[in-house]
Amino acid sequence: MSNIIIREAIPGDLNALLECEQGIVRYERPFDGTLRDGEIHYYNLAEMIVADHVHVVVAEVDGKIVGSGYARIEKANPYHKHEDYAYLGCMYVEPEMRGKGINSLVLEALKNWCRSKNITELRLEVYTYNEPAIKAYEKAGFKPILTWMRMGLDE
């Protein structure tokens, strides 16, 4: 395999990032019956690419974007020890490229950016039954701290 390049996203990457986002949606639909049918968007990627408080990165192999991720600086709740934290999202690697360390490289780039901004707390969300993602994040050092629960009163 060619070299994997992790770089900051630019506006010209928007279409590829939107494809990554739709890959996430397709993968997550089986975990969440509350998602609307058709094309949906989790993120405003066009804004995020140019925002100062967000760092969007892409993973490239042979000039093709095969993965993505972002870190967005958020204000912490006043009862937390830290004032700010980074929320990670749009974490995606194309299925045929998984298992090659790309997600680890994306995470490392995001962690480095967070350190440069004096952010010491990282958070992300993952579906309870998305065991491959949970294992990957735990391997990277994340620990589960809260379980979200839902109930549909019309189900």
What name fits each language-model region?
Residues 90-93, 99-112, 135, 139:
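Conserved acetyl-CoA-binding loop-helix of GNAT-fold acetyltransferases
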Residues 114-125:
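Conserved GNAT acetyl-CoA-binding A-motif
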Residues 58, 64-73, 87, 92:
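Conserved beta-strand in the GNAT
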Residues 25-45:
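Conserved GNAT-fold acetyl-CoA-binding loop/helix
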Residues 5-19, 30:
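A short beta-loop-alpha structural element at the N-terminal edge
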Residues 46-58, 87:
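A short helix-loop-beta-strand connector motif used in the catalytic cores of GNAT acetyltransferases and
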Residues 82-95, 147-150:
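Conserved acetyl-CoA binding element of GNAT-fold acetyltransferases
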Residues 104, 128-146, 151:
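Conserved active-site alpha-helix within GNAT-family acetyltransferase domains
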